Amino acid sequence: MLILRLTLAGDREALAQKGHFYGVYLLCSQSVDVRHRGKCYVGFTVNPKRRIRQHNRGSSFGGAKKTSKKGPWQMVMIVHGFPNKIVALQFEWAWQQPTLSTRLKIFDDLRRKLPRETHFDYNFRIVNRMLGVGPWHRLPLTVRWLETDYEREFQLPLPRHMRIVSGKVAITTSQRALAVKRTAAAAAATASWSSECHLCMQRIEHPERSRFSCLNASCCLSCHMLCLASYLLDDQPGQYLPIVGNCPLCETPLVWAELLERKRFEQGVQIQGEDENEEEDRDELSDCPDVDSDVEHICELSD
């Protein structure tokens, strides 16, 4: 199984298995034709590196019709961390159609681009607003700058649990090996975990799927996923998805998204035996899950 390497600011690394990465990106045209230069395009992808190649090669190679022959394009930013493909596609549609989105059409300032405002600034203003309203403001999202020339401050502050980082997204063989080592280490650590949940005191069946532990390696917390979620949501009636909280044993700050990411990671990562470059060349034009955003009608999240 492939590993996406996400290079964060400060040399911090995060790992995501292929099949668990869903991103909504913003392209900016660098065309020499003044009719197209500076125009923007919002799309969805499971593989940013491959997707930008498709856009720049044209619609015959998997790129969107709307971007064909209007480039070259730069992927300047991407929002990722969505729990599944459907939620990411809904976010993409709302970003493309703020005047039609139930969540966004109430904001008069998003109805049109302001005089002398660039297409990028307008799209950035839309996504800034989106990240502060429901249901997206509760998601553990990461805003990733891919081109430093476009980086700027958000006028509206983002929720505390969201991250703003810089760096490319790449698939590397070395990260696959690292993933296997970490998985083996996690498996070894489970041997010392309690077989009972610290919160409900019941036996944890199928611990490989349902047992959660603390992010603090020295903490011995062992509990059901649902028990920990209920504990973290104790003071948030009406909510079903935790965001942040503290460990019930050691008070270490916990980020629910990081717990889920680690659980997926611990469930096993297989190393592909074939050469990475050959695999990427073979797959780059058949990105089946990487739906193009020319789709006009996608249902929004229910109110």
From Swiss-Prot:
Classification via InterPro entries: GIY-YIG_endonuc (IPR000305), GIY-YIG_endonuc_sf (IPR035901), Slx1 (IPR027520), SLX1_C (IPR048749), SLX1_endonuclease (IPR050381), Znf_RING/FYVE/PHD (IPR013083)
Residue intervals of every SLX1-type zinc finger in the record: 197-250
Bias type Acidic residues, positions: 273-293
Chain positions covered by the region annotation Disordered: 270-303
Intrachain disulfide bonds: none
GO molecular function, one term: 5'-flap endonuclease activity
Family: Belongs to the SLX1 family.
Protein name in the entry: Structure-specific endonuclease subunit SLX1 homolog
Record organism: Drosophila mojavensis (Fruit fly)
Lineage of the organism: Eukaryota, Metazoa, Ecdysozoa, Arthropoda, Hexapoda
